[in-house]
Amino acid sequence: MKAIILISEASLPLAKTLQRELPDTLIYTKNECEGCISITSCHRFIEEHFNDFDSIIFIGAMGICVRSIAGCIKNKYKDPAVVCVDSTGRFVISVLSGHVGGANELTRHIAAITGGEAVITTQSDNAGLWALDTLAEKYDWKITVPHAEMNRLVTLFVNREPTVLLLDIKDKGTEYLERTLPAHVKVFYHFEDIPQSLSLIH
C-alpha cells in the first residue's frame, strides 16, 4: 500500500494523477478534498503510520517531508520507501530506502508519469554500478552476511576497491553480472583459483 501525503490542495490534480497510475494508493491531506482521507497533522500521521505503508509519497516541500519522517527512521532494511515530489511534479526526489525499499525505482516511475526529473543520489546508481543490497531479492538469491557487513561491502564496492567475484553457479543473475562487470571486479569460477590475499564477495 502506498500513501500520498498532499501538503497543498493546489497539487490535488497531481495527486489524483499519481493515484490513478500507482496501484493501491491512498491520498491523505489536512485539506477537505473529495476522494482524499482527512488527517489532522501530517507529522502525527507519519509518526503513527510510518511502517503501515511500503511507500510514502510527499507532494510538497522537501523540508516538510524530512521533518515529518525524521523521528521514525530506523534503517534501510525496515524503513518504507519515501519519495518527495515538488508541487508541480517537476522534481521527484528519492529520500529514503532507495535500494532495499524501492524508492529509487518508484522515483523513476513517478518522474515518467509527471514528465519530471528523477533526483537520485545513491552512488551506485549514479556511477552505473550494481546495487549489491538488492541483487539477492532480484535474482532469488540469499544474503548470508549480517546487514552491517553487507553495508561495509557495499561501501568498498561503490568506492571501486578491487573486488573478487566468485561465480560457481550459472543463472540469469550471474549472466547479468558477467555482462555488466565493472573494471574493478575480477571474476573467478573456482574458489581454489582465488589468491588468498584477495577479498571475496560470494
Language-model-derived ranges and their functions:
Residues M1-N31:
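N-terminal basic/disordered segments at the start of proteins
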Residues I5-A10, T29-E32, I59-M62, Q123, ...:
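Structural motif
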Residues S11-A15, I64-S68, A103:
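Short glycine/serine/threonine-rich phosphate/pyrophosphate-binding segments
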Residues I27-E48:
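N-terminal beta-loop-helix "entrance" segment that forms/cooperates
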Residues I46-F50, S55-C84:
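Hydrophobic/aromatic-rich, well-ordered segments within soluble, folded domains that form packed cores
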Residues I73-H99, E105-T121:
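Short, acidic/small-residue loops that bind anionic groups at enzyme active sites
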Residues V100-Q196:
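Internal alpha/beta core interface subdomains
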Residues I201-H202:
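Conserved small/polar residues in nucleotide/adenosyl-binding loops
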